[in-house]
């Protein structure tokens, strides 16, 4: 029996019934969240003497989850002013907030630790604003290392035809020729992020080796930095969440420890999101209708792409289970679809489940990351509720 309630059908159904939850809804397992954050922190500390995890709040910005990140000594990785506000509301120390891109003035006013800047023009703007406010601002330059993350092309971020980052040769030339003219910024490090949902650790090995070369070139030009931010990207097992509820953080950090030469000299940063929260959440939905079209069995549920857009957007595949005790020996292959007026509103095709009837509940697993945060009100849908168990 699995120790986590979201993977125990009986206990999950009891919780839903006892609290009269209205579907669709998200349910998060607090014990799994705590265990995952603790595991990540222990693995980090075992592998490095001077490193920090910044929780990538874009994965799930629920205040309770941000509070758990703070509890385990993690900083927050933000990409908007709203995310900075959420972190500050949860009393996260601004010196443990890193920020990429927008709402620059808000970040400067709150004295965040550093910007992760991904264009040279952005650095000019930051310097101008900092000069006007008479402040010094820390910046890590986001490098595009031209590394294939071997992931879906929508979430690849580290190749030259991706929109993110600056080619290292341009960074080196700028540091040598232009940096001296920017009086209100301090370049303290390099920032990388090659993609998301990365399962092949060879990608992280390549990133570590590439970063070694970049540091070597900087030092050959008498340019010294103190921080390296490797970003995130560590994936989760969407096919077997019950068997693999917590990712191999030890293997992830050990790969950087083994192949990055400067671990003992520099402060290292990691921006983890999906790997910390993805497996902790389940989207619960109710069967609205069954229908058969020329032999194809459809089950229409009350959750749609407005609640979980990943299948429609990324062709993502989530494990789905029927929370029922009857008909478990009677199987049927279904197209599992939502009620939204879009042909892409499909969770799975030819997916085998026990025979379903109106009112049965389904659990869509691995929905703790990029689920509720990507929800929309398209078709004037009400906001999906979240619960912690």
From Swiss-Prot:
Where substrate binds, per the record, is at: 274, 310, 314, 342, 370
Domain of life of the source = Bacteria
Q: Which cofactor does it need?
A: pyridoxal 5'-phosphate
Q: State the top-level EC class.
A: lyase
Residues bound to pyridoxal 5'-phosphate are 233, 271-274, 370
Molecular-function GO terms, alphabetical: diaminopimelate decarboxylase activity; pyridoxal phosphate binding
- Metabolic or biological pathway: Amino-acid biosynthesis; L-lysine biosynthesis via DAP pathway; L-lysine from DL-2,6-diaminopimelate: step 1/1
Q: Which residues carry this modification: N6-(pyridoxal phosphate)lysine?
A: 58
What this protein catalyses is:
meso-2,6-diaminopimelate + H(+) = L-lysine + CO2
E.C. number = 4.1.1.20
Q: Which UniProt keywords apply?
A: Amino-acid biosynthesis, Decarboxylase, Lyase, Lysine biosynthesis, Pyridoxal phosphate
A biological process (GO) of this protein is:
lysine biosynthetic process via diaminopimelate
Q: What does this gene product do?
A: Specifically catalyzes the decarboxylation of meso-diaminopimelate (meso-DAP) to L-lysine.
**Quaternary structure and partners:** Homodimer.
The similarity comment for this entry is: Belongs to the Orn/Lys/Arg decarboxylase class-II family. LysA subfamily.
Kindly give the PANTHER family that the UniProt entry links to this protein. Answer: DIAMINOPIMELATE DECARBOXYLASE, GROUP IV DECARBOXYLASE
What is the name listed in the Swiss-Prot or TrEMBL entry for this protein? Diaminopimelate decarboxylase
Q: What is the lineage of its organism?
A: Bacteria, Pseudomonadati, Pseudomonadota, Gammaproteobacteria, Thiotrichales
């Amino acid at each position: 029996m699995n120790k986590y309630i979201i993977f125990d059908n009986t206990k999950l159904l009891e919780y839903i019934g006892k609290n009269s939850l209205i579907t669709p809804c998200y349910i998060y397992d607090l014990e799994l969240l705590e265990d995952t954050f603790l595991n990540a922190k222990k693995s980090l500390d075992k592998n490095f003497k001077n490193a920090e995890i910044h929780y990538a709040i874009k994965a799930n910005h629920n205040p309770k989850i941000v509070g758990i990140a703070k509890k385990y000594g993690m900083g927050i990785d933000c990409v908007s002013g709203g995310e900075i506000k959420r972190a500050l509301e949860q009393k996260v120390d601004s010196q443990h907030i890193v920020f990429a891109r927008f709402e620059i003035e808000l970040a400067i006013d709150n004295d965040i630790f550093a910007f992760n800047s991904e264009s040279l023009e952005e650095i000019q703007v930051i310097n101008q604003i900092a000069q006007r406010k008479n402040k010094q601002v820390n910046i890590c330059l986001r490098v595009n290392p031209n590394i294939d993350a071997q992931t879906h092309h929508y979430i690849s971020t580290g190749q030259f035809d991706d929109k993110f980052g600056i080619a290292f040769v341009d960074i080196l030339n700028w540091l040598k020729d232009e940096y001296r003219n920017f009086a209100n910024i301090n370049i303290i490090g390099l920032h990388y992020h090659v993609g998301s949902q990365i399962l092949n650790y060879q990608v992280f090995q390549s990133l570590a080796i590439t970063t070694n070369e970049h540091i070597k070139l900087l030092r050959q030009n008498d340019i010294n930095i103190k921080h390296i931010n490797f970003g995130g990207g560590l994936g989760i097992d969407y096919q077997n969440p019950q068997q693999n509820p917590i990712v191999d953080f030890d293997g992830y950090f050990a790969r950087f420890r083994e192949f990055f030469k400067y671990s003992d000299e520099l402060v290292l940063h990691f921006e983890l999101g999906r790997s910390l929260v993805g497996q902790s959440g389940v989207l619960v939905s109710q069967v609205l209708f069954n229908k058969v079209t020329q032999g194809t069995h459809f089950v229409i549920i009350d959750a749609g792409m407005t609640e979980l857009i990943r299948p429609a957007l990324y062709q993502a595949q989530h494990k789905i289970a029927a929370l029922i005790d009857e008909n478990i020996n009677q199987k049927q292959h279904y197209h599992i679809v939502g009620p939204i007026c879009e042909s892409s509103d499909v969770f799975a095709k030819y997916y085998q489940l026990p025979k379903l009837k109106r009112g049965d509940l389904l659990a869509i697993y691995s929905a703790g990351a990029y689920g509720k945060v990507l929800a929309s009100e398209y078709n004037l849908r009400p906001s999906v509720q979240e619960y912690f168990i």
